[in-house]
From Swiss-Prot:
InterPro entries to which the protein is assigned, alphabetical: HGPRT (IPR050408), Hxn_phspho_trans (IPR005904), PRibTrfase_dom (IPR000836), PRTase-like (IPR029057)
Signal peptide: none
Family: Belongs to the purine/pyrimidine phosphoribosyltransferase family.
Record: residues binding GMP: E141, D142, V143, V144, G145, T146, G147, R148, T149, K173, F194, V195, D201
Gene3D superfamilies: 3.40.50.2020
Record's protein name: Phosphoribosyltransferase domain-containing protein 1
Residue positions, PTM N-acetylalanine: A2
Protein's UniProt keywords contain Secreted: no
MF terms (GO), sorted A to Z: magnesium ion binding; nucleotide binding; protein homodimerization activity
Quaternary structure note: Homodimer.
Single biological process term from Gene Ontology: purine ribonucleoside salvage
Keywords from the named record: Acetylation, Magnesium, Metal-binding, Nucleotide-binding
Functional summary from the UniProt entry: Has low, barely detectable phosphoribosyltransferase activity (in vitro). Binds GMP, IMP and alpha-D-5-phosphoribosyl 1-pyrophosphate (PRPP). Is not expected to contribute to purine metabolism or GMP salvage.
Length: 225
């Protein structure tokens, strides 16, 4: 609000998890038995993820001003975050004095092999991005690391002249390789760790894990391709 003395919240940073955070003991939670021995610890429990996403939805709706939204979900890791975020956005819309139209489209970006980011990004799907012209676009991503992948996607989308583009990412990694890109809305800022769970995968494994966890070396080797 113009003229307000209150400091604007930093939506692009989110809940900050420090580098020395030891995480939660796996024995305090339930998780799939087929992953026993493959994980170091729970970084973010499922309940905290859900609560944080609910707050993100409120922040997004307040910022966008109850305008119609075209949601562009980045698959595959972003689908769970996107589904839960959209559901919360719809709940807010149901209780508002104005209907907010929300349409969802999907795109896949391939930039990881094993636990390493590849040099080039592959864009799969989203052939008809011309439908984004004049729309308020919300890109929903699972993890922002270096920022190069998201910058490349934004550059591609901007060609279609949307009215507005906002980026919501569940996680933002602190890494020396970052080019400085920050999403408009972030769930959590985390250390530069390779995390799995809540639809985040390691070579297609761990998507069925509800919590966000840190994979150990045994798990990396077990599921390496």
């Amino acid at each position: 609000m113009a003229g307000s003395s209150e400091e604007a919240p930093d939506y692009g940073r989110g809940v900050v998890i420090m580098d020395d955070w030891p995480g939660y003991d796996l024995n305090l939670f339930t998780y799939p038995q087929h992953y026993y021995g493959d994980l170091e610890y729970v970084l973010i429990p499922h309940g905290i993820i859900v609560d944080r996403i609910e707050r993100l939805a409120k922040d997004i709706m307040k910022d966008i001003g109850y305008s119609d939204i075209m949601v562009l979900c980045v698959l595959k890791g972003g689908y769970k975050f996107c589904a839960d975020l959209v559901e919360h956005l719809k709940n807010i819309s149901r209780n508002s004095d104005r209907f907010v139209s929300m349409k969802v489209d999907f795109i896949r970006l391939k930039s990881y092999r094993n636990d390493q980011s590849m040099g080039e990004m592959q864009i799969i799907g989203g052939d008809d991005l011309s439908t984004l012209a004049g729309k308020n676009v919300l890109i929903v991503e699972d993890v922002v690391g270096t920022g190069r992948t998201m910058k490349a996607l934004l550059s591609n989308i901007e060609k279609y002249k949307p009215n507005m583009i906002k980026v919501a990412s569940l996680l933002v990694k602190r890494t020396s390789r970052s080019d400085g890109f920050r999403p408009d809305y972030a769930g959590f800022e985390i250390p530069n760790l390779f995390v799995v769970g809540y639809a985040l995968d390691y070579n297609e494994y761990f998507r069925d894990l509800n919590h966000i966890c840190v994979i150990n070396e045994h798990g990396k080797e077990k599921y390496r391709v």
